[in-house]
Amino acid sequence: MKHWKKMAASLIAISTMVAVVPTTYAMESEDSQPQTTDTATVQTTKAAEPTLLASWDFTGKNGTTNSAIADSTGKYNLTLKDGAKIEQYGDRSNNEALSLRGDGQYAQIDDQLFKDAGDSFTLEFASKTRHDDSGKFFSFIVGKDGSNDANTTDQANANKYLMFYNSKTAIKGVISNNNWGNEQGSKVTVSGNDNSWADYKIVVDGTNLAVFRNNALIIFKANTGIKMSDLGATTAYIGKSFYSVDEYWNGAMDDIKVYRGADLTMPTAVAISGTGVVNNKLTLIEKDSTKLTATVTPDDAVSKNVTWSSSDESVAKVAADGTVTGVKAGTATITATTELGGVKAELPVTVEPMNAQNAAAADLDAAIAALKVPAAENLPLVAKGTKNGSAITWKSSDEKLITSTNEKYENRTTGADDPYRGAGIINRPAYGDGDSKPVTLTATASYNGGEKVTKTIEVTVKEKTRIAPDTGYAAVTFESDSNGGEKAWVASTEKNDFFTFKTRNNGQAVLTNDADTGGLRDMFVLRSHEGDKYYLIATDLKVSSMGWSQNQVNGSRKVEVYESTDMMNWTRTNGDGNGGITINTPNAGMTWAPEAYWDDDLNAYVVFFSSRMFTDDTRTTPVKNDKTGNSSYAQVRYAITRDFVNFTEPQMWQDTGYSRIDSTVRKIGGYYYRFTKNEQGGAAGDYITTGKSIFLERSKVLTAPTTEASPGQDPNTGWQLLEQALLPFEGPETIKLNKDDELNTKDDDGYILLSDNFAYRAFMTTGAELSKTTWDNPMTKRYPDFNNEKKPVKAEPGAQGYITQGANGGLPDKVRHGAFVNVPESVLKVTKSWTAANPTHIEAVDSTTKAVYNAGTRELTATVTSADKGTLAGSVKFSAGDWSKTVKLDAEGKATVTLPASVSGTVAVAYDGYTDGLVNPSDTTVDGIEQGKVDLAELNKQIAAAEALKESDYTADSWAKLAAALKTAKAALAAENQGEVDTAAADLKTAIEALQKAPTNPGEGDGDKGDGNKPTTPTTGDKTNVNKPGSALSNTGTAVLGLGGAVVALAIAGISLTLWRKRRA
């Protein structure tokens, strides 16, 4: 074979081989000398030289079409079909080549060729492609063209094939024994492939598959589990797919050669090195990490990939990239195993204990650094350190503003335990009251019961935000799988009518992923629990560049998370420029269709997503289940967050052994309702029998795990299956209709359910109808055509079923899986005006101030309203001439003042807005105010009552307070302000009631305290001393005499007590 080095095809019995790190060193002491061990001699057997079976170079065949062309041996034919022909190519020195232009053109190779090639063969050819990366064609395929290409449940009749795919931007090579469901291999992105020739080689060696491009290995899959003989047939096409709906390839192929036998150079040895590796050993401190490198020989081995493993992950764990981390004190062995051949090297690792104080301090530093201040959301006051796992407790200086750790917290019997143990729940001051005073949080950490470390941080709690009624809707969707279609488009309604969506930003995308895979799909948007902002969380996925298979293993490892106050101006929650956030574990191959919902029990958000799990961090062997034909499947996991920056470790949420994806949640009454797609092509257990459709469950515990789909589940502790196949296909979403949407019900119970059936479909219902749904009383029993797209119902309050309203059903024209959210008028306006060239922001809404004057009470009440009917904060200033008074608005937007009697004419009433600038000022005036008359009746009554009393009857202190109040009251007789008069009367009355009687017997008690009796007020008609100020003054000598007598009596009593005690002694 030209251009390819002939090397050994396999290794046999290499268990005696010793790599640079022998296992015999694992328990060697530090004082001992390392053993000298010769590297084991690797015995290799040179495979028989690959034998040429057939070749076509098409020389002299220019113009041939619709006929058979024999190979160089004359034994096998390549037959041109439906317009396929041989053409000369100037970019290939005018060589003739097989030319396929789509439109049904293809070539077929005799079945016998690949039957003769057997389980190990090599295919070489030159090729160019003119085909976009649509994912819907095959360039070359050999195997069984089955009668079932619609699902993966009927494996006996499924397509089974070895396939090569050549597009302008990607190459794919896979082998499968069950349609797309078990494709083994991968798809890779390549450059310079558009209409350009390249040399390719496909090598199949038993269950090993390799694809080379221009002599470079681009795809390799060891141990596919599928041999060519497992495919059941050897039908071979160039340019035609086994799938009836696929396209025909647009490309060319030349110099086709098929050999019996494989030509793969196998690894012969592997050695481990890295920082800290000394004498073939590694020592780490707990929580420390170091990067290991595996060197595979020979240099031209077909695969130098290795998988890493640990003999004890509780002591030392190792990531897929070779980073080893000490977990706890002890010993373990790290092993590197070649992907091909299973050649191993082992490295003994000793993990020494960490210093408890340093460990605790590191955990505290990380926990405090994670806090976003000032606080507008509950704080992630973790009970367990994220670095080292220290136990952390938090103490708040003001429990009314921020809660402390609940030291009596007990783990829940079902669902997630609170990772914050009651700490960090904030109580924001009311809108208009301003931010809180600083609260001191004291965090105390202890690592493994060691020395406690304490640190503090001051946190200000922000006042509540302004809230306005929702008067429209917004949506965020993506367009398609094609290049340029995996971005976020924003649409919004023209008015408060759900079926009036229009794509904004002149039809262009609003948000593009500038990091990671570069794609955004399956967006979900929710308003924050406190209402300040919107969060957007999306799948990091670009099918157009990486394909589906690779993205389920090595792509889609993060989620892209953004926040915005107006749905158009988005920033990353973790800071622009930082890319996505990894919330999944290293052994999870994808993080798809993320959504979130508020958990009332955890006081936090629960973020859930689908993942295909693997047995270890290398993500080479998927977790399989015999329920699905022993194939991998998608599970749904969740993590908890309070800020969409810091997430807890993910936990299993839904693992029934069958593929699930696209869960969305809505709480109605006391239940969470969960809509999820059955990703299986058919049944998923005993109850869900319809594949690729959406089923409904409910539970009172959002994070309760699901291991079985059953109507018999207790919804108090798990998820109860209510209905299968409620909605078609995938991407379910729900939204509650706005209160004033004309399609809403009178009791404000209208809902829209949506599903992505290759474009969004809308179904109307109510919360009451969803709540009625049970397995025995499903929605489709009560409304048989509920999900029948051929029988739409009229859009009206209380409608039940499929709605179609004009173009796209009145829904966004960017039709793929996204999210829908209610928005107030201020946000709706931004969505309509915003463009990338001229990004707008929320503008202040107008306000109106009205004032009503009550001449009888002289009260002037101002009422401020906003154009969007939202909440208000700030103050109203009342002014006339030299007089003014500023009064804070109450919760209803009102402020009241009592006008002084001297104020007359016109009073100005002005609302100045608030510090957040969200509402414009407004003002008004009140004319015709007449000067007030002061009513002195009550004041004179209280003065008369006070002057009727005798000072000698009361204690000195209480009488002094009365005298002061009386003086103020008499001064108020000349006041022009009724309020001043009323206050003086009230204060005088209070002083009278507070008088304390003087003791009548000098030996009784303390004269300053009196006997506690209340004074007797004059009877009606007694005018003595009324309005005679001098008559209220008493003879102070009387009071002094009474006090002196009390002192003498006390002295005598003291002497008597002393003499009595002496006698007793």
From Swiss-Prot:
Signal peptide: 1-26
UniProt pH dependence: Optimum pH is 5.5 with larch arabinogalactan as substrate.
Subcellular location: Cell membrane
The BIG2 domain, residue ranges: 277-346
Principal location: membrane
EC number annotated for this UniProt entry: 3.2.1.55
Ranges where the record places region Disordered: 997-1031
Thermal dependence summary for this entry: Optimum temperature is 50 degrees Celsius with larch arabinogalactan as substrate.
GO cellular component, one term: plasma membrane
Keyword Cell membrane on entry: yes
Disulfide bridge map: none
Primary enzyme class: hydrolase
SUPFAM superfamilies hit by this protein: Arabinanase/levansucrase/invertase (SSF75005), Concanavalin A-like lectins/glucanases (SSF49899), Invasin/intimin cell-adhesion fragments (SSF49373)
Catalytic activity as recorded in UniProt: Hydrolysis of terminal non-reducing alpha-L-arabinofuranoside residues in alpha-L-arabinosides
InterPro entries membership: aBig_2, Big_2, ConA-like_dom_sf, Glyco_hydro_beta-prop_sf, Invasin/intimin_cell_adhesion
Transmembrane segments: 1040-1060
Compositionally biased intervals (Polar residues): 1014-1031
GO molecular function terms listed in the Swiss-Prot or TrEMBL record: alpha-L-arabinofuranosidase activity
Keywords for this protein: Carbohydrate metabolism, Cell membrane, Glycosidase, Hydrolase, Membrane, Signal, Transmembrane, Transmembrane helix
Membrane topology: Single-pass membrane protein
Function text: Involved in the type II arabinogalactan (AG) side chains degradation. Releases arabinofuranose (Araf) from alpha-1,3-Araf-substituted beta-1,6-galactooligosaccharides. Can use radish root AGP, larch AG and arabinan. Shows weaker activity with gum arabic and arabinoxylan.
Family as reported in the entry's similarity comment: Belongs to the glycosyl hydrolase 43 family.
Protein name: Alpha-L-arabinofuranosidase
Native source species: Bifidobacterium longum subsp. longum (strain ATCC 15707 / DSM 20219 / JCM 1217 / NCTC 11818 / E194b)
